């Protein structure tokens, strides 16, 4: 908890208290019966007569005393004017000092209304209640309200009698508490140290140039979320990562979107949102100071936003980056001579999948002496897509080896070439840069033909075993549909999971 900016905040509240005392004194002078014990619960005849005879004195605008610390940083990020800051302080005061509840109850002439109303806030800022310049700072599109820093309640009431409330998360932030909003648990998280990612130079340059919308197309093993987070960090922003699927499924979706934007503004952060399948809440999360990085597997849909994004593909991580991720996650638990990147080179894993696979390998190794072996690594890697595939195909755990095959030597040689191609494709395509044009050539395809019982499935099982992979068989009857489009979708789901 950082409390270094509290003295400045308390000094600003003290200045507000002096203005409130002046307002209370002026109110008591004009009140025909200031000591009435039922004041605020009814209006006497004398009070009505005094109200009818009252005249408004000329308003004296407040003198801004500057901003510093967290209040100043928030004003800069949220693009608050000096009037916005003063309105925020007026609304904030009862949450920091309980005496302000009584002050506001008195000035509101209602002991049950212990927060500042819009009218009272404007008066304390030295503005007429009818001043458009002041009222506009409290409408839904204003910087304070749009960023979720101030809530104007009681919408059914006349504007001047609507209560102003500062959300607890904003109060806590200004008091030095950096914990994220509890409402975002399971939906969003703050990323302090993004995982190793691909080159982010182009994205960083765009963010520093003022681009506020980025779309990353997720490729297998690419790690779009980590790419976006790394770019934001290098561009000087914090990172709030949002699970778009969970956000979309929450019943209070709209309020959570506001909470995400507020968290990003408080932290001076950007938002990483994905994976998206349909139109994301770009307008609700839009803010001139908050970069928004959206990612998904589909191409960007121009109908999602009137502002075009900076587009980039999140391609698979280079071998060196994957190796560094494995080493960072496993530390000194690896068995001697084991290269995790080589052992899992034929698995297409992104940064998050590598992190989960490394953790799974470490857990499995605990019952085998605590040393992580190649078998542990491959089992952890296999587990990253097993759940999704088993819903679409039948899993076979290989239990045979090359010596179990009874085939002509030439056929066995071809099978071993096929296995070698799958094993070393990462080195050939990534390290040696032998990828064909158009992004083709990553997959390995084999066509086995022969009568029943000649060893087609067994050969596939042997290849899978040599690579440390599981084998999945697909029943075409569950895939082929009378509509060609549905058949294509079924096949795409299988290969995407694989």
Each language-model region and where it sits:
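Short, hydrophobic-biased segments on the C-terminal half of alpha helices
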Residues: 141-142
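Short, hydrophobic/amphipathic alpha-helical patches that form generic packing surfaces
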Residues: 11, 83-96, 146, 230, ...
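A short, conserved structural fragment
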Residues: 145-156
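Short helix-coil junctions and helix-kink-helix linkers
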Residues: 108-109, 120-133
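Extended, charge-enriched "interface" segments that sit outside catalytic cores
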Residues: 1-62
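Structural motif
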Residues: 74-84, 132-133
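Conserved nucleotide-sensing/catalytic segment adjacent to the nucleotide-binding pocket
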Residues: 256-286, 496-498
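AAA+ P-loop ATPase motor domain of ring mechanoenzymes
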Residues: 42-77, 103-113, 158-240, 244-249, ...
């Amino acid at each position: 908890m950082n409390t270094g900016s509290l003295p400045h905040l308390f000094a600003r509240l003290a200045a507000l208290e002096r203005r409130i005392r002046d307002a209370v004194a002026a109110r008591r002078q004009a009140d025909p019966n200031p000591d009435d014990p039922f004041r605020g619960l009814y209006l006497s005849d004398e009070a009505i007569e005094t109200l009818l005879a009252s005249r408004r004195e000329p308003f004296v605008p407040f003198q801004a005393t500057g901003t510093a610390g967290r209040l100043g940083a928030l004003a800069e990020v949220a693009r608050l004017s000096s009037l916005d800051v003063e309105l925020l302080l007026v609304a904030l005061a009862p949450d920091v000092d309980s005496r302000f509840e009584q002050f506001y109850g008195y000035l509101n002439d209602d002991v049950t209304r212990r927060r500042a109303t819009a009218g009272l806030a404007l008066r304390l800022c030295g503005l007429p209640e009818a001043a458009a310049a002041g009222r506009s700072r409290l409408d839904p599109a204003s910087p304070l309200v749009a960023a979720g820093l101030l809530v104007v309640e009681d919408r059914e009431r006349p504007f001047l009698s609507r209560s102003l409330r500062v959300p607890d998360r904003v109060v806590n932030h200004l008091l030095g508490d950096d914990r994220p909003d509890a409402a975002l648990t399971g939906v969003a998280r703050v990323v302090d140290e993004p995982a190793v990612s691909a080159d982010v130079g182009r994205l960083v340059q765009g963010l520093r140039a003022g681009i506020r919308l980025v779309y990353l197309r997720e490729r297998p093993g690419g790690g779009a979320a980590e790419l976006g987070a790394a770019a934001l960090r290098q561009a000087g922003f914090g990172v709030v990562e949002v699970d778009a699927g969970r956000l979309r499924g929450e019943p209070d979706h709209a309020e959570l979107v506001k909470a995400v934007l507020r968290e990003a503004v408080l932290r001076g952060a950007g938002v990483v949102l994905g994976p998206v399948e349909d139109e994301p809440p770009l307008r609700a999360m839009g803010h001139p100071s908050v970069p928004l990085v959206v990612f998904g597997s589909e191409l960007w849909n121009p109908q999602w936003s009137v502002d075009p994004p900076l587009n980039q593909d999140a391609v698979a991580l280079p071998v060196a980056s994957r190796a560094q991720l494995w080493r960072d996650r496993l530390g000194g638990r690896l068995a001697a001579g084991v290269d995790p990147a080589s052992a899992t080179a034929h698995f297409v894993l992104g940064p998050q999948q590598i992190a989960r696979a490394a953790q799974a390998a470490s857990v499995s190794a605990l019952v085998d002496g605590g040393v992580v072996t190649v078998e542990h690594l491959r089992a952890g890697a296999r587990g990253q897509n097993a759940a999704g595939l088993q819903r679409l195909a039948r899993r076979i755990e290989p239990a045979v080896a090359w010596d179990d095959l009874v085939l002509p030597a030439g056929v066995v040689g071809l099978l071993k070439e096929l296995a070698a191609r799958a094993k070393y494709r990462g080195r050939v395509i990534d390290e040696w840069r032998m990828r064909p044009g158009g992004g083709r050539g990553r997959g390995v395809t084999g066509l086995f033909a022969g009568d029943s019982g000649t060893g087609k499935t067994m050969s596939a099982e042997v290849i899978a075993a040599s690579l440390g992979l599981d084998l999945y068989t697909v029943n075409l009857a569950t895939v082929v549909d009378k509509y060609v489009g549905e058949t294509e979708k079924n096949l795409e789901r299988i290969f995407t999971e694989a």
